[in-house]
């Protein structure tokens, strides 16, 4: 289960990784403090939003346990498919983005990149896992990937943005399929 949570953490961090690469492309001089701010904003929100989804879904879990595997699969497949689709769309908003790292620039980005994580939290409510460990792993993973994304964007340009987003989406879809197939008895 720990590997599965780590894979989910890596997958949901791909949006922030891609945005961080975009920010890295626009920065003339990247400071360590900028990377730390980015890691804290993105990691914090990616940890908070699944927690919100988890507690909201836990309240209603007794009403949906008969179809929980379909909910998990549907949400993860939807998020993953959306990530793959977005990788192939032209993202003019990120191209115009300023390299600022203050709250006025980071808050909207952190919220926008973390909205999908609410659905991940909803799916967590139907899994047997430690929610606190899960959100800590997601937050740390996202923080590391977003800080790395800044540096990669600064050094290598936009070459890895699309493949990272596609990989993250595919992993989420595969985890959703795994949960579904386990429940249906296809996997032991």
Swiss-Prot record:
Main subcellular location of this protein, as a coarse class: membrane
Bilayer disposition of the protein: Multi-pass membrane protein
Membrane-spanning segments: 1-21, 40-60, 64-84, 105-127, 131-153, 166-186
One term of GO molecular function: manganese ion transmembrane transporter activity
One GO CC term on file: plasma membrane
Keyword Cell membrane: yes
Keyword Zinc-finger: no
Family named by the database record: Belongs to the MntP (TC 9.B.29) family.
Annotated protein name in UniProt: Putative manganese efflux pump MntP
Organism of this sequence: Bifidobacterium adolescentis (strain ATCC 15703 / DSM 20083 / NCTC 11814 / E194a)
Name of encoding gene: mntP
